[in-house]
Amino acid sequence: MSGDYEDDLCRRALILVSDLCARVRDADTNDRCQEFNDRIRGYPRGPDADISVSLLSVIVTFCGIVLLGVSLFVSWKLCWVPWRDKGGSAVGGGPLRKDLGPGVGLAGLVGGGGHHLAAGLGGHPLLGGPHHHAHAAHHPPFAELLEPGSLGGSDTPEPSYLDMDSYPEAAAAAVAAGVKPSQTSPELPSEGGAGSGLLLLPPSGGGLPSAQSHQQVTSLAPTTRYPALPRPLTQQTLTSQPDPSSEERPPALPLPLPGGEEKAKLIGQIKPELYQGTGPGGRRSGGGPGSGEAGTGAPCGRISFALRYLYGSDQLVVRILQALDLPAKDSNGFSDPYVKIYLLPDRKKKFQTKVHRKTLNPVFNETFQFSVPLAELAQRKLHFSVYDFDRFSRHDLIGQVVLDNLLELAEQPPDRPLWRDIVEGGSEKADLGELNFSLCYLPTAGRLTVTIIKASNLKAMDLTGFSDPYVKASLISEGRRLKKRKTSIKKNTLNPTYNEALVFDVAPESVENVGLSIAVVDYDCIGHNEVIGVCRVGPDAADPHGREHWAEMLANPRKPVEHWHQLVEEKTVTSFTKGSKGLSEKENSE
């Protein structure tokens, strides 16, 4: 009853208030009465509706701004980044100069690999200057190469070259002398236009020519571009034809041909050494002592470097400068070259340059040091191996160079870098690196401990010239994997140090029937991990060194036995044990 009474009382109160509001004069304009009437009739409140509309407009505006930002970001990624990347050079990766055209000279070939021509022509008397001045413009003295912080390949300014358009005095003198541009100059990379005219100039001594003379010289350049393919040279194109009416003018640049009947057959091929200036005693800068190239294969370009021996610290300093005219190993017409350096006969210690993408004329400018006593330097040889980097298969060997007489070469003037032909080598055994680990077996506990110590000289699997290696050890029995253990990942290194123990439980009665497969794997954030190399130890391992290590472990229980093992390619090892079926493809990939 109390509930009904209260409800009835509330209804009566509402009716009373409604009557009072109805009798009040100007009740429609009274805020309280209007609010009360709206509540009685169920109408929404005005301020609440305004707040809802304002909140909705704010949400819509915010969503529009977010969508606009997302659309701008997607447009930038899809349009601006590819357009910007198209501006890169097809050879050296640098920006393509828009002002290069058919009428430019060698100055247009910035980083294009044609500076071996300018360096060779700079030492000829027709160009009015000694040879070493031309080389000094390209390579600074060796003292500057050994400044603090220079190790590791600091960048040097790009070399400049002879540009006929930039020297109207010499161009006018060439036109007056009747010198014609060589239409069959050696192939130059197409960064600035491979068909630029190369003029052989007499000694300059005239005044400034007029603008008309400058225009005449630039019009002599060929109007067509030549593809970057070797084309035969004839004896006529190797020399320039001066005006026969002038007897006092010196003859054209004499470029000597290779001697001997066999070398005479190579006249129709490009020979970069013909354009190198002559050194002391008439010896060309590309030849001389210590030019013992590896093998007698066909030349695969040229490599430039500088040597110096530090007597105080017994250090042989080697600076890799650049390479020219490398062969194309990829389907896109380029290569991804890098250089490995050994000081023979020791092949365990090696250095490697960075990988240069999509170029046939890489500029390295990287310095390395070998510790070698002066008494041993005469018996040591410097070995350069030029490789083409391949992300998904074995790296291709482009060629190699072997140098002896290192002390004599190190005493060459520092401002004159050495040039050598890169000779095509035979199939070189894949150098995947070495792994150092120890084995220890506890018979009473039935525990086999594999301590991964370190690895050295691993194969570079990333474009940075490094790898992200980790070690995976698998316990194998009758060709089946029973257990596996892994080490941690070491980032950006080819010589990782682990010092990590991997423990396996092996019963004493089973130790004669099991073995280990140890693989060094390169970790990839995107895609599958790649095996760098493997080594296998056990009583029936195919490698004799693996069998010896296992037998020594069993002969010395409770003592760690440490050995170095050479890594081999996984596909070359068909089975872990002789006569076993081997690991399945799925197990190997895990």
Curated annotation (Swiss-Prot):
InterPro entries: C2_dom (IPR000008), C2_domain_sf (IPR035892), Synaptotagmin (IPR001565). Binds 3 Ca(2+) ions per subunit. The ions are bound to the C2 domains. Residues 1-54 are vesicular. Ca(2+) 4 binds at residues 462, 468, 522, 524. One of its GO terms (biological process) is regulation of calcium ion-dependent exocytosis. Ca(2+) 2 binds at residues 330, 388, 390, 396. The keyword Repeat applies. Residues 299-420, 431-565 form the C2 domain. Ca(2+) 3 binds at residues 390, 393, 396. It is found in: Cell membrane; Cytoplasmic vesicle, Secretory vesicle membrane. This is Synaptotagmin-3. The lineage of its organism: Eukaryota, Metazoa, Chordata, Craniata, Vertebrata.
